[in-house]
């Protein structure tokens, strides 16, 4: 990949443009995809490799090929299992204890991002890119790369969103490649990137429980949440993945239990995010916002043949019925906080 970076800018511009033409994508998206893969390669070659796991939309797209939307950022789980805060978490009890743990965990994360993550990123970026922490988001590292192509909505920066409030297991090792290497393998013969990522089954149940929570939301849908509805349906279209997820209902319980502790909100109703009481269909009061958000996302981030929102909702209704028809299990804790009120 470094050989490609060292090519004259005119050659890189032509290769990126031709790749974009083949894939019917914007050149700026192909260019950013290259730099996302480069950052991931350097990240998982660095001393940080054993401290982070790749997750989120970019992971679903690049690692598993489950979604077709262009994802720009890199979501990372930061391992806190060996941190002192674990003892406090394990002994915490009640609302006050949980709040103390959340505050301590947020503080620990900010310290790790500034003291460990940023220096390591700056080290591998060298003079190629610049890395910094935005003042208002201390849990984020922004990497600015040297762009060739301009875009109205694709920023020439990669956002590393780092946080410990996600389960470490199950995870898997995978190899990814930038779009350029897939189209012109002879030009990037060192483009294979090894990453460690959240399992697709866990990602499926994570997304499903997001929709369950949104179905109970008393207020308006947050910005950019239409992507979760699209992602769930695209993942469910992968029959093999869906069958594996359905065969591991215990994992759903663990996901819901974890969220009930770390992302507790009375209206989210995570204790009922299980077979027999799962809700995935959006409530009427968020539909208008969902329609606008989906239309915007479809125009900017989805391929031309992306399904309509009506199609998404139709498949979601079927999925809701399927999940509710699964056999419920006794509540399983397995080293995660319980779901008691």
Language-model regions, residue ranges each:
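Structured mid-to-C-terminal alpha-helical surface segments
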Residues: 1-52, 64-68, 79-341
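Glycine-rich beta-strand-to-loop/alpha-helix junction loops that act as flexible
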Residues: 54-58
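Betabetaalpha-Me/HNH-type nuclease active-site subdomain
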Residues: 61
């Amino acid at each position: 990949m470094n050989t490609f970076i060292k090519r004259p800018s005119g050659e890189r511009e032509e290769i990126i443009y031709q790749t974009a033409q083949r894939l019917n994508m914007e050149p700026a998206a192909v260019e950013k995809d290259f730099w996302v893969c480069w950052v991931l390669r350097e990240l998982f070659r660095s001393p940080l490799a054993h401290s982070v796991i790749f997750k989120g939309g970019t992971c679903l797209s690049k690692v598993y090929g489950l979604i077709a939307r262009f994802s720009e950022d890199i979501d990372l789980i930061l391992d806190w299992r060996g941190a002192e805060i674990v003892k406090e978490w394990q002994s915490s009890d009640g609302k006050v204890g949980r709040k103390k743990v959340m505050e301590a965990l947020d503080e620990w994360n900010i310290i790790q991002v500034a003291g460990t993550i940023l220096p390591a990123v700056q080290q591998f970026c060298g003079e190629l890119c610049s890395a910094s922490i935005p003042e208002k988001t201390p849990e984020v590292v922004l990497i600015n790369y040297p762009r060739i192509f301009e875009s109205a909505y694709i920023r020439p920066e990669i956002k590393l969103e780092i946080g410990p409030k996600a389960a470490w297991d199950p995870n898997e090792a995978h190899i990814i490649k930038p779009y350029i290497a897939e189209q012109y393998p002879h030009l990037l013969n060192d483009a294979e990137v090894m990453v460690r990522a959240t399992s697709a089954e866990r990602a499926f149940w994570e997304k499903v429980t997001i929709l369950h929570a949104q179905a109970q939301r008393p207020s308006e849908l947050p910005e950019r949440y239409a992507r979760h509805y699209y992602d769930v349906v695209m993942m469910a279209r992968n029959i093999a993945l869906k069958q594996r997820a359905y065969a591991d209902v215990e994992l759903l319980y663990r996901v819901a239990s974890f969220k009930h502790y770390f992302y507790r909100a009375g209206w989210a109703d995570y204790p009922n995010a299980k077979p027999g009481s799962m809700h995935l269909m959006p409530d009427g009061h968020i539909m208008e916002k969902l329609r606008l958000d989906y239309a915007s996302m479809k125009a900017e981030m989805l391929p031309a043949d992306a399904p309509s929102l009506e199609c998404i909702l139709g498949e979601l209704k079927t999925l809701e019925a399927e999940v509710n028809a699964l056999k419920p299990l006794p509540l399983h804790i397995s080293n995660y906080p319980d779901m008691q009120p």
